[in-house]
Design a protein with these regions (language model features):
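Conserved beta-strand hairpin/beta-sheet module of binuclear metal-dependent hydrolase folds
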Residues: 1-66, 70
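Residue-level marker for buried hydrophobic side chains located in beta-strands
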Residues: 38-40, 82, 111
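Metallo-beta-lactamase
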Residues: 59-73, 77-89, 105-130
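Short glycine-/acidic-enriched loop or helix-start segments at secondary-structure transitions
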Residues: 49-50, 92-94, 123
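Metal-dependent catalytic neighborhoods of phosphoester/phosphodiester hydrolases
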Residues: 91-101
């Protein structure tokens, strides 16, 4: 998580557990206008397999879908989803698994991302593929 920063430095503010894991939060933003319901980032999601989640604790009972419901809306009410960037913890919640199929969670939404980041994500250089 902290790259080349030594653990003795980052663990002062982010203590790790016995598995060297730290608490982190992903926050999304829901914006209601007169004719739009815009979601900024969709979070991690839950379509990943057990091996994936062995590296990430999912704590707390909320999901992006539950949070939208608590605000009085349904996933189908979302008109636009804007991704700040295309890392899995920001866009993973936009897709759900139905059996072997992956389908959009927000079926009525247009999806938006910065052009430069889209190009980076869809045409990675050799270092970015690693």
């Amino acid at each position: 998580m902290f790259g080349v920063v030594p653990k003795v430095i980052w663990e002062k503010t982010n203590p790790a557990d016995d598995l060297n894991m730290i608490d982190m939060a992903a926050r999304s933003l829901l914006i209601e206008t007169t004719n739009k319901l815009i979601l900024i980032d969709a979070g991690l999601g839950d379509k990943q397999n057990e091996k994936f989640f062995s590296h990430y604790y999912k704590w707390g009972g909320d999901s992006i879908e539950n949070s939208i419901k608590k605000a009085g809306f349904k996933s189908s009410d979302i008109t636009d989803v804007f991704f700040t960037h295309l890392h899995f913890d920001h866009c993973g919640g936009a897709i759900i698994r139905r059996g072997e199929r992956l389908i959009p969670r927000f079926e009525n939404a247009d999806f938006w991302v910065n052009k430069d980041h889209w190009e980076w994500a869809t045409s990675p250089k050799s270092r970015g593929r690693a």
